[in-house]
Regions:
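Nucleotidyltransferase catalytic core that binds NTPs
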Residues: 1-182
Length: 182
């Protein structure tokens, strides 16, 4: 079996990839507009993400997490797809797996599904309310070692100490998309 050796000039160094990883955005997407999509687009360009996956959660999951949602799942997905229509589909996608399940899906189950489906490394973006809930889950310690968490300081929710203890795995983003300190 041929090995496929290639000749390269002395001192050749392979260029690092121009884009890296997948950004998984966990949100309700209920009150989103072009502004929020623009913010995500700017973050994706700045950090050079290869793929951005928007993951709206079913109302059963949101109810169990204690996160209010007035709109049904299918309306939020339709709104999100409408907002993303002008962006390149090969880079920006909406994953509707949770809508097919039509029931409560734990965050770690969703993360397991998404990490099996998309390329690594993984960056998970959540607002501060989601992140505070996620830090209280049993599987948080396992997942924070596998993903890097981008916490969007959107609602001013105080973050638990367990989350802040993993400061090297967290990045904080202000309301306008700028990097902020805790």
């Amino acid at each position: 079996m041929a090995r496929g050796n290639t000749m390269v000039p002395f001192g050749y160094e392979e260029e690092p990839p121009a884009q890296r990883g997948t950004l998984l955005v966990f949100e309700t997407f209920e009150d989103w507009s072009e502004d929020e999509i623009g913010l995500i687009e700017a973050i994706a360009d700045q950090r050079k993400f290869r793929k951005v996956v928007f993951y709206p959660q079913h109302e059963e999951s949101l109810k169990r997490m204690g996160i209010p949602s007035a709109s049904p799942y299918h309306k939020r997905v339709k709104l999100l797809e409408e907002l993303l229509r002008d962006l390149p589909a090969e880079r920006y996608t909406v994953d509707t797996w949770e809508g097919k399940r039509k029931k409560y899906t734990p965050v770690d189950t969703s993360l397991r599904f998404l990490t099996e489906k998309f390329a690594s490394p993984y960056f998970v973006m959540m607002n501060d309310r989601y992140a505070a809930e996620f830090a209280g889950y049993k599987g948080f310690d396992e997942w924070i070692r596998k993903v890097r968490l981008l916490v969007w300081k959107r609602f001013g929710v105080p973050l638990p100490g367990k989350l802040l203890a993993y400061g090297e795995r967290l990045d904080f983003i202000g309301e306008k998309g700028e990097s902020v300190e805790v």
